[in-house]
């Protein structure tokens, strides 16, 4: 349940749906496994996984939701070879070249025949709805997966006025200034990893790992016009992260000490522990968002 990435969105209008109403809305779009002829299936599933029983898990007016996607695995090479064999056989028997439309129909037949025997894979994506911040935090490093979740949520609710999080000043401008200053605004602390990119299209990219970012070798690249597009940070003593210039957060990791905050509860009651961990994570992510918005100079004004 602990989030590992953050793709960030904000509401254009206040989110005011209660937990029960949200649960009811999502119930019409629940996940069901692929049938024999399904290529993929996508829907909402229990927010807390196997231990949970609801599509929405809420605490302190913070709502956790989850989508599950199942996809049949159809190797492209197998389809290609089967199609080539069938096309060659028919063209030889009928002494003519098949049209593209005929080849496409044959390909569909092959896929239909393979689907019942195909293996499938499942993936899950979670999101945290934070009405107090008018934000949605999607636990995904893929903008495509985040948009898939939001599209289904929009379908369930009828509308979902959200936009990607954007700041008054470019994120890379702030990250570059932090590197020049040798420190990030508190409570953030720079670590030993960064990616610098030239503003020019034909310019280069330089990556530093396990290196003191205050060294002249690093700072010299700023003098040539490069800007910081990725920067490893610590948020207090609780979270390690990689902040990117598109305002997304990768490699989010809660410290062992922080996650141990609910150890006194034990694991005898898994649901109670999950509930406590969710509350702990939610509170810290809210604190992280407040600090991030402040450190980056505030959010860009939205159009009403």
From Swiss-Prot:
One GO biological-process annotation of the entry reads: DNA recombination
What does the sequence similarity comment in the record state about its family?
A: Belongs to the RdgC family.
Task: Give the subcellular location.
Answer: Cytoplasm, Nucleoid
Q: Which UniProt keywords apply?
A: Cytoplasm, DNA recombination
- GO CC annotations on file: bacterial nucleoid; cytoplasm
Top-level taxon in the UniProt lineage: Bacteria
Alphabetized PANTHER family for the sequence = RECOMBINATION-ASSOCIATED PROTEIN RDGC
What organism is recorded for this protein? Answer: Shewanella sp. (strain MR-4)
The protein in question is named Recombination-associated protein RdgC
Sorted alphabetically, which HAMAP family does this protein's record hold?
RdgC
Task: Extract the GO molecular function terms from the UniProt entry.
Answer: double-stranded DNA binding
Role, per record: May be involved in recombination.
- Give any Pfam family that matches: RdgC
């Amino acid at each position: 349940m602990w989030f590992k990435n953050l793709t960030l969105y904000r509401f254009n209008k206040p989110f005011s749906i209660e937990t029960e109403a949200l649960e009811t809305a999502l119930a019409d779009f629940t996940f069901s496994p692929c049938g024999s002829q399904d290529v993929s299936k996508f829907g909402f599933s229990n927010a807390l996984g196997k231990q949970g029983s609801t599509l929405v898990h809420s605490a302190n007016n913070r709502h956790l939701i989850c989508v599950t996607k199942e996809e049949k695995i159809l190797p492209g090479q197998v389809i290609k070879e089967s199609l080539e064999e069938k096309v060659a056989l028919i063209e030889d028997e009928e002494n003519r070249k098949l049209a593209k439309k005929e080849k496409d129909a044959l390909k569909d037949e092959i896929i239909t025949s393979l689907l019942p025997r195909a293996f499938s894979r499942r993936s899950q994506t979670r999101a945290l709805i934070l009405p107090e911040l008018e934000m949605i935090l999607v636990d995904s490093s893929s903008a495509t997966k985040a948009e898939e979740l939001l599209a289904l949520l929009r379908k369930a609710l009828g509308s979902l006025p959200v936009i990607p999080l954007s700041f008054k000043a470019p994120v890379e401008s702030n990250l570059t200034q932090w590197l020049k200053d040798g420190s990030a605004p508190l409570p953030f602390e720079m670590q030993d990893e960064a990616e610098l990119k030239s503003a020019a299209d034909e310019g280069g990219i330089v990556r530093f790992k396990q290196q003191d970012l205050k060294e002249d070798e690093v700072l010299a690249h700023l003098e040539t016009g490069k800007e910081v597009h990725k920067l490893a940070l610590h948020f207090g003593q609780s979270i390690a992260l990689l902040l990117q210039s598109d305002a997304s957060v990768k490699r989010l990791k809660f410290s062992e000490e922080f996650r141990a905050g609910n150890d006194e509860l034990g694991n005898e009651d898994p649901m109670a522990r999950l509930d406590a961990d969710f509350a702990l994570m939610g509170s810290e992510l809210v604190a992280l968002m407040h600090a991030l918005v402040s450190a980056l100079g505030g959010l860009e004004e939205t159009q009403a």
